[in-house]
Design a protein with these regions (language model features):
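Terminal targeting signals and extreme-terminal segments of soluble enzymes
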Residues: 1-88, 94-102, 106-151
Length: 151
């Protein structure tokens, strides 16, 4: 059963856009970007997102005594990238009350705007004892108040 959401009731997501130029070492024998590189492009997007919205980068997690492993990753390939193509990576944080980080990604080819790939990832918080957190860590709640209430 679908929920009936009121228009405007969903908070706008935080987004960041970054780019990368495809290197020769990233293509396979078919001269297109090897499928595993798209996962790295997603990570490039998350890292750039963390620089734009400080406080949720990997080093921040470590400083607070947490890690945030990926527990789910979805990726759909739409069109190829080749050497020297510039990939535009849009990364969007999807706000959730659950103790996790949900990101969506869209990758376009700069030269023609073509959609290349899209996907999503889910990360959970794990404390220094190796336990998965059932509630958001305090630092993340503070980060959310800082950045998500500015929207």
């Amino acid at each position: 059963m679908k929920r009936n959401r009121k228009i405007g009731s969903v908070k706008p997501a935080l987004t960041n856009t970054t780019q990368t130029t495809v290197r020769f070492s990233e293509v396979d024998s078919m001269q297109v970007v090897w499928h595993g590189e798209y996962v790295r492009y997603f990570e490039d997007g998350r890292e750039a997102f963390g620089r734009k919205y400080p406080g949720i980068g990997y080093l921040d997690f470590y400083a607070y005594g947490y890690t945030a492993p990926i527990v789910d990753l979805q990726l759909q390939y739409v069109a190829p990238l080749t050497v020297n193509d510039v990939a535009i990576i849009e990364t969007r944080l999807i706000d959730t009350a659950a103790a996790k980080l949900c990101f969506e990604y869209i990758i376009h080819r700069e030269c023609d705007g073509a959609l290349v790939a899209r996907g999503s990832s889910v990360q959970v918080f794990v404390d220094s004892d190796g336990n998965m957190c059932l509630n958001n860590p305090t630092f993340f709640e503070e980060w959310k108040r800082r950045w998500l209430t500015k929207q």
